[in-house]
């Protein structure tokens, strides 16, 4: 899975950071220390870590991922990463 989306809401200085969905690579999620959860009202699972986005981006860079783009959607910040 060469593409990865991560996001955070409201403040980027603190976590949590969403790092994947139920179809994400379980090995990568384990390396990031991510927990799987299902928020009340949603019919899907997501992986999250309590780290702020900067820490997550540093960890992903060490694993060969590079940021392709970043955007803000309302109060949500989203990064798209790719691994060669």
UniProtKB/Swiss-Prot annotation:
Q: Which residues form a coiled coil?
A: none
Q: What is the first-listed, main subcellular location in coarse terms?
A: nucleus
> What is the tissue specificity?
Liver and kidney. Somewhat lower level in testis, heart, brain and lung.
Quote the Gene3D superfamilies the UniProt record gives: GTP cyclohydrolase I feedback regulatory protein GFRP
Pfam families attached here? GFRP (PF06399)
The record's GO CC annotations read: cytoplasm; cytosol; dendrite; intracellular protein-containing complex; melanosome; nuclear membrane; nucleus; protein-containing complex
Task: Say if the entry is tagged with keyword Membrane.
Answer: yes
Swiss-Prot/TrEMBL keywords: Cytoplasm, Membrane, Nucleus
Where does the UniProt annotation locate this protein?
A: Nucleus; Nucleus membrane; Cytoplasm, Cytosol
Record GO biological process? negative regulation of biosynthetic process; protein-containing complex assembly
GO molecular function, a single term: GTP-dependent protein binding
Q: How does it assemble?
A: Homopentamer. Forms a complex with GCH1 where a GCH1 homodecamer is sandwiched by two GFRP homopentamers. Interacts with GCH1.
The family line of this record is:
Belongs to the GFRP family.
What task does this protein carry out? Mediates tetrahydrobiopterin inhibition of GTP cyclohydrolase 1. This inhibition is reversed by L-phenylalanine.
List the protein's name: GTP cyclohydrolase 1 feedback regulatory protein
Please state the gene responsible for encoding this protein: Gchfr
